[in-house]
Amino acid sequence: MNKKFNLIRVTTYNNIEIDSVIMENQDLTVVMSKMDDMLKSDNLEIVEHSYDFCGTEIIYHTTDDNIIYCVVEVKNG
């Protein structure tokens, strides 16, 4: 069984985080391609990435301090 992932865009506005689910239950290549398209359309670049403690979420920081992307592994069950 292939792992599935969600793509989430987190935007900070006036110290409030707004989470937008962009894609759900997709293959990793599909999620990464969509994130790349969105970065290009917003003229952003990835400046660094980090992992959560369990390694199920990758956080991508962009050149805009108010926008990050998260790729989250979907857990079965």
Cite the ranges covered by each PLM segment.
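Short aromatic-glycine-(Arg/Gly/Cys) micro-motifs in beta-strand/loop hairpins
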Residues: 1-19
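Generic structural motif
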Residues: 10-12, 26, 77
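A short, exposed loop/beta-hairpin motif centered on an aromatic-Gly-Thr core
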Residues: 16-30
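Short, surface-exposed linear segments at secondary-structure transitions and domain or protein termini
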Residues: 28-35, 77
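Short, mixed-charge low-complexity intrinsically disordered segments
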Residues: 37-77
